[in-house]
């Protein structure tokens, strides 16, 4: 009898997860296990968290029992989530170096945590690496190291865990910010590895890199190229952000939706694409813009309702 209930619950989850969900990155400083309830209370149906301090390469690992309970809370509140890996992970360092090995340990720790959380976790998002000058590497060598890092982390973690590669903003020495670079990484993996690697499209980042997504035409062009070179079915989620800086600025500064340089026409087109392909939208917006109608800083509820109206 218990088995039938579990199968039924799983079937319902599969059906419900095949629709576009809306949410945002949330802070877990007020409690880790209570984070799903908090996310639900503010209106999220999907959310993102760091498991530890984002600027620390090796935060203390979460306890097994709290990770399992966290997963139960996701089921209770009908939520999907994704873990964002430490900002300091850099797989472009030479394999065997202390910084490379520490990056692997950090990523493996988070992947193992998602295994305990369960199948309502989309995986672990990591940034593109940086080809820092002290390593004296070519860009291709740095990308080769990045591929080695992915392969290494996958080989040390359960087969049901997933790495999600986030598009970069071309800041500084960041590699593979363009679709060609992402494809170079992806197609260096074998079939089994590719099954465990997905992508997160950050709208602010691709705008900063030089993809003009301010119009439906530009949005269609970007996703058409991505589909041709990688496949849109490999997009796990979209970091849905406007940008405070101009096209091809190579500067990563998120803006609230419709209060930045990308604007409503492009953002609406992205929401429409997400709905068509059932891709989840996760906002990382600063919520610092002033609503001219209220003369107050905008709230997540305002952004949520805005995006929800675009998905109708």
UniProtKB/Swiss-Prot annotation:
User: Highest lineage ranks of the organism?
Assistant: Viruses, Varidnaviria, Bamfordvirae, Nucleocytoviricota, Megaviricetes
InterPro entries xref list: AP_endonuc_2, AP_endonuc_F2_Zn_BS, Xyl_isomerase-like_sf, Xyl_isomerase-like_TIM-brl
Functional summary from the UniProt entry: Endonuclease IV plays a role in DNA repair. It cleaves phosphodiester bonds at apurinic or apyrimidinic sites (AP sites) to produce new 5'-ends that are base-free deoxyribose 5-phosphate residues.
Q: Which UniProt keywords apply?
A: DNA damage, DNA repair, Endonuclease, Hydrolase, Metal-binding, Nuclease, Zinc
**Protein name as annotated:** Putative endonuclease 4
* UniProt remark on cofactor binding: Binds 3 Zn(2+) ions.
Residues recorded as binding Zn(2+) 2, renumbered to this chain, are 166, 202, 239, 284
Q: Which annotated residues bind Zn(2+) 3?
A: 205, 252, 254
| Annotated source species | Acanthamoeba polyphaga mimivirus (APMV)
PANTHER family referenced in this protein's UniProt entry, alphabetically = APURINIC-APYRIMIDINIC ENDONUCLEASE (PTHR21445:SF0), ENDONUCLEASE IV ENDODEOXYRIBONUCLEASE IV (PTHR21445)
Q: Name one GO biological process term.
A: base-excision repair
Q: Which GO terms describe its molecular function?
A: deoxyribonuclease IV (phage-T4-induced) activity; DNA binding; DNA-(apurinic or apyrimidinic site) endonuclease activity; phosphoric diester hydrolase activity; zinc ion binding
Q: Which NCBIfam families match?
A: nfo
